[in-house]
């Protein structure tokens, strides 16, 4: 009986644990994902591509703008969930061109000034969403 009750409580609580996190509206409603989902004491953020503004070249002025766009979108999702960059425990970085890795690092580091750097992986990816030059996906610890 005790194990059946425990199973029932876990089953009943599971939908509440998997509810999408509150977030600003940067992701259009027709896209098939949530900006972030809390589970197991963590907040899993969807990848952010940081759109390059029209008329900018991705590999000159546009790349830095894309990094800023992605990291600012991550910051907005964190803020809407009562968190900040210091709560990030892991980031995965996908770059369309691995020669942009030093430029990415230079633009990424200021977001963690005075904070612990999260664990991170980075790899080259052929064909990111919407032709983006990068995508950044993070996991944050909930408070």
Model-derived regions, located:
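N-terminal presequence-like segments and the immediate start of the first folded domain
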Residues: 2-90, 94-143
């Amino acid at each position: 009986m005790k194990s059946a009750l425990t199973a029932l409580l876990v089953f009943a609580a599971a939908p509440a644990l998997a509810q999408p996190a509150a977030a600003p509206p940067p992701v259009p409603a027709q896209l098939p994902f949530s900006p972030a989902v809390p589970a197991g004491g963590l907040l899993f953020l969807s990848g952010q591509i940081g759109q390059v503004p029209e008329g900018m070249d991705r590999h000159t002025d546009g790349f830095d703008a894309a990094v800023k766009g992605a990291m600012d979108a991550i910051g907005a999702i964190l803020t809407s969930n009562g968190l900040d960059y210091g709560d990030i425990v892991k980031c995965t970085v996908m770059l369309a061109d691995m020669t942009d890795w030093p430029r990415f690092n230079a633009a990424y580091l200021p977001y963690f000034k005075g904070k612990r750097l999260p664990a991170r992986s980075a790899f080259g990816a052929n064909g990111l969403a919407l032709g983006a030059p990068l995508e950044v996906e993070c996991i944050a610890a909930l408070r």
